[in-house]
Regions:
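Short acidic, Gly/Ser-rich segments with clustered Asp/Glu that frequently serve as metal-coordination loops
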Residues: 21, 26-35, 60, 121-124
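Von Willebrand factor type A / integrin I
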Residues: 133-193
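Structural beta-sheet core signal
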Residues: 22, 53-55, 114-116, 145-147
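Acidic, polar low-complexity linker/tail segments
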Residues: 1-20, 31, 35, 39, ...
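Short beta-strand-loop
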Residues: 55-79
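Exposed acidic/Ser/Thr-rich ligand/metal-binding surfaces
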Residues: 93-142, 184, 188-193
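Von Willebrand factor
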Residues: 74-112, 150, 154-157
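Short glycine-/polar-rich loops that comprise or flank the Walker A/P-loop
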Residues: 18, 47-51, 111-112, 139-142, ...
Length: 193
């Protein structure tokens, strides 16, 4: 009860980075962008701790393990071997539904930032895509969509059915067509925490 008063030190609150989930379209319509998106995913996985990477064409494939390779070319080669539907068709809704059912409900993206990289060209059932996007937007903290067709056009309006269905659930729509646009994404991600 007697003695010197204790000195209280306030510590700053630790900033915790949210988990980052990258879901990359590797279908034929995204062939011009798939390699650069996977290189971005490799860099993200190597520089940040809680990063999960998935690819899809007609089905979802988890490639997080492949992204842990030190050499980017080896990581891309392993990812290409894992995804049998590279440069094939696109079933965005089915792939996102598989992600929600198999991974998101287990807490993988709960409170995290989910980045979907796709042009929105989908051959699947629009109702499946709508339901998957709605569930994904509820489970994640932020839902970002990279569409390489957006380029740097501020007047861009979604024109594909997949993009029109996804648009109401997206928190941020960015381009993903070149290195500068991926650098912009990297700069924006910390602010989404």
């Amino acid at each position: 009860m007697h003695g010197e008063p204790a000195r209280l030190y306030w510590r700053r609150r630790k900033v915790r980075l949210r988990p980052l989930v990258l879901i990359l379209d590797i279908s034929g319509s995204m062939a011009d962008y798939s390699r650069s998106l996977l290189q971005f995913a490799h860099s993200a996985k190597r520089s940040a701790g809680r990063v999960e990477v998935f690819c899809f064409g007609t089905r979802l494939t988890r490639v997080t393990g492949a992204m842990e390779c030190r050499r980017p070319d080896e990581a891309l080669e392993r990812a290409a071997r894992a995804a049998f539907d590279w440069d094939g068709g696109t079933r965005i809704g089915d792939s996102l539904d598989a992600f929600v059912r198999g991974w998101a409900r287990r807490g993988l993206c709960r409170g995290g930032i989910v980045v979907i990289c796709s042009d929105g060209l989908d051959r699947g059932d629009p109702a499946v895509l709508a339901a998957a996007m709605e569930r994904l937007s509820r489970l994640s903290h932020r839902l970002v969509w990279l569409n390489p067709h957006k380029r740097d056009d501020p007047a861009f309006r979604p024109s594909t059915l997949g993009m029109m269905i996804a648009a109401p659930h997206i928190d941020l729509l960015l381009s993903g067509h070149d290195l500068a646009s991926l650098e912009k994404l990297a700069a924006v991600l910390p602010g989404l925490n």
